[in-house]
């Protein structure tokens, strides 16, 4: 695919016309040596929908370890042999500290993440009660508590949590290679229930877990069909003791191609680069915005250290971009 065709696709995307599947498949199969040719077009689409504003989010690991699911990549799975921390649901004071950290560091959105297939209803109520006392003041609230039902979502929404995070993780055709203790359809149902409850949905996946380039596209199209609002893109950090500890499917250029492909497939949806940004993209990680990303996760990840928010703010300023604030 030549640069002119990419730019023509970008102009069509800006007008709300998503590319033909055959064109997206051609992008998915593009050799790595041509990936940088995608960036001007992908960046044009990002800039059309988001201007120079960048979405920043951060998370706190609200409950860690002893998860009964067997996700091949996860350090918190009971099936893994790792040194990941194990602790119960944190108290409300620690939840408040996470929100304060976001506010003090100019972060647009704060999310509480809990391990496990689903958080017990009593603990969902505890989380909702804590969020109800946080107040807004420039930060939007998100939760990632597993496979919940309509009653849970109504409780969270009433407490001021306006977005729910629940990844599909990978393409449906690859899902059973990654997880066998629950079904892909369970994740889809959760996303639909959250949307039905009137919540914004953040749903994406993890890359570098054995998926093909066409399966990257398959996931992107599934997310498009579900009409999710924000798509977190994670790149595998192989963790010793997990089934994917020796996985090495990623290069900096492949990461950029994945971002660009998703931008073309998803049009004006948020694309937020999360786990594995620095370790996989290395010196190229500031290029995520030019590849089509509209945001990044800053601060620490669930079980791995991340990047200082002030470093990310400095990078954003050097790129001529600005950090988004809640309400803008």
UniProtKB/Swiss-Prot annotation:
It comes from the Bacteria. It catalyses: (4R,5S)-dethiobiotin + (sulfur carrier)-SH + 2 reduced [2Fe-2S]-[ferredoxin] + 2 S-adenosyl-L-methionine = (sulfur carrier)-H + biotin + 2 5'-deoxyadenosine + 2 L-methionine + 2 oxidized [2Fe-2S]-[ferredoxin]. Its cofactor is [4Fe-4S] cluster; [2Fe-2S] cluster. Residues 50-277 form the Radical SAM core domain. Keywords: 2Fe-2S, 4Fe-4S, Biotin biosynthesis, Iron, Iron-sulfur, Metal-binding, S-adenosyl-L-methionine, Transferase. [2Fe-2S] cluster binds at residues 111, 142, 202. Pathway: Cofactor biosynthesis; biotin biosynthesis; biotin from 7,8-diaminononanoate: step 2/2. [4Fe-4S] cluster binds at residues 67, 71, 74. It holds the Pfam family BATS. SMART domains: BATS (SM00876), Elp3 (SM00729). Its EC number is 2.8.1.6. One of its GO terms (molecular function) is iron ion binding. GO terms for biological process: biotin biosynthetic process. Binds 1 [4Fe-4S] cluster. The cluster is coordinated with 3 cysteines and an exchangeable S-adenosyl-L-methionine. Binds 1 [2Fe-2S] cluster. The cluster is coordinated with 3 cysteines and 1 arginine. Belongs to the radical SAM superfamily. Biotin synthase family. Homodimer. Catalyzes the conversion of dethiobiotin (DTB) to biotin by the insertion of a sulfur atom into dethiobiotin via a radical-based mechanism. This is Biotin synthase.
């Amino acid at each position: 695919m030549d640069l002119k065709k990419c730019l023509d696709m970008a102009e069509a995307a800006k007008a709300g016309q998503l590319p033909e599947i055959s064109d997206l498949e051609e992008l998915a199969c593009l050799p790595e040596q041509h990936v940088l040719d995608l960036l001007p077009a992908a960046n044009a689409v990002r800039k059309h929908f988001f201007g120079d504003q960048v979405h920043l989010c951060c998370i706190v690991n609200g409950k860690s370890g002893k998860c009964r699911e067997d996700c091949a990549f996860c350090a918190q799975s009971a099936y893994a042999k790792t040194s990941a921390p194990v602790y119960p649901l944190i108290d409300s004071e620690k939840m408040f500290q996470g929100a304060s950290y976001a506010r003090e560091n100019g972060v647009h959105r704060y999310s509480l993440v809990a391990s496990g297939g689903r958080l017990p209803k009593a603990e969902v109520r505890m989380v909702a009660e804590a969020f109800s006392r946080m107040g807004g003041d420039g930060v939007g609230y998100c939760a990632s508590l597993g496979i919940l039902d309509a009653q849970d979502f109504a409780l969270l929404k009433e407490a001021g949590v306006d977005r729910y995070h629940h990844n599909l993780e990978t393409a449906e055709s690859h899902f059973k290679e990654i997880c066998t203790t629950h079904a892909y359809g369970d994740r889809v149902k959760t996303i639909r229930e959250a949307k039905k409850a009137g919540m914004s949905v953040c749903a994406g996946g993890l890359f570098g877990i054995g998926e093909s380039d066409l399966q990257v596209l398959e996931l992107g199209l599934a997310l498009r069909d579900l009409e999710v609002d924000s798509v977190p893109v994670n790149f595998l950090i192989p963790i010793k003791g997990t089934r994917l500890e020796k996985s090495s499917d990623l290069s900096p250029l492949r990461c950029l191609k994945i971002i660009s492909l998703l931008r073309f497939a998803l049009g004006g949806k948020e694309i937020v680069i999360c786990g594995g940004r620095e370790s996989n993209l290395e010196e190229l990680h500031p290029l995520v915005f030019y590849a089509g990303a509209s945001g990044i996760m800053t601060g620490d990840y669930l079980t791995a250290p991340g990047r200082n928010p002030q470093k990310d703010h400095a990078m954003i300023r050097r790129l001529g971009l600005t950090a988004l604030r809640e309400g803008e």
